[in-house]
Curated annotation (Swiss-Prot):
One of its GO terms (biological process) is translation. PANTHER family: 60S RIBOSOMAL PROTEIN L12, LARGE RIBOSOMAL SUBUNIT PROTEIN UL11M. Gene3D superfamilies: Ribosomal protein L11, C-terminal domain (1.10.10.250), Ribosomal protein L11/L12, N-terminal domain (3.30.1550.10). One or more lysine residues are methylated. It comes from Nitrobacter hamburgensis (strain DSM 10229 / NCIMB 13809 / X14). One of its GO terms (cellular component) is cytosolic large ribosomal subunit. This is Large ribosomal subunit protein uL11. The keyword Ribosomal protein applies. HAMAP family: Ribosomal_uL11. NCBIfam families: L11_bact (TIGR01632). Belongs to the universal ribosomal protein uL11 family. Signal peptide: none annotated. Part of the ribosomal stalk of the 50S ribosomal subunit. Interacts with L10 and the large rRNA to form the base of the stalk. L10 forms an elongated spine to which L12 dimers bind in a sequential fashion forming a multimeric L10(L12)X complex.
Length: 142
């Protein structure tokens, strides 16, 4: 018989840096989950990732206080900032340009994010990435 799901918890945790301090500890502790068990399992699964890459994670909480978690790909903004070699996006997107990304970089990001996006083709994913780039104040060059 399947376990009864009591809730979901979405967090964004740096790769290989999960520890019981806030925000992870209190979020898991309030729901009665074993914080160290999550931290060890998450850090073990993110060993091959670049250190401190933000990893979105969805934790499924069961009635017996056990849990499973699913890791997503890093946020699109993270990939765009890396590609443009900038620290943050533009304060006034549309007016000020924060940097520039090429179509090849956009395609690469779209292919990495494909499994988490709600689209079927790489071209559709590319248009989503381009939209995110524009909203960050990045220009998409040919």
């Amino acid at each position: 018989m399947a376990k009864k799901v009591t809730g979901y918890l979405k967090l964004q945790v740096p790769a290989g840096a999960a520890n019981p301090s806030p925000p992870i500890g209190p979020a898991l502790g309030q729901r009665g989950l074993n914080i160290m068990e999550f931290c060890k399992a998450f850090n073990a699964q993110t060993q091959k990732e670049e250190k401190n890459t933000p990893i979105p994670v969805v934790i499924t909480i069961y009635a017996d206080r056990s849990f499973t978690f699913e890791m997503k790909t890093p946020p699109m903004a993270y990939f765009l900032k890396q590609a443009a070699k900038i620290q943050s996006g533009s304060k006034a997107p549309g007016r000020d340009s924060a940097g520039q990304v090429t179509k090849a970089q956009v395609r690469e990001i779209a292919e990495k994010k494909m499994k988490d996006l709600n689209c079927d083709t790489v071209e559709a994913a590319m248009s989503m990435v381009e939209g995110s780039a524009r909203s960050m104040g990045l220009q998409v060059a040919e």
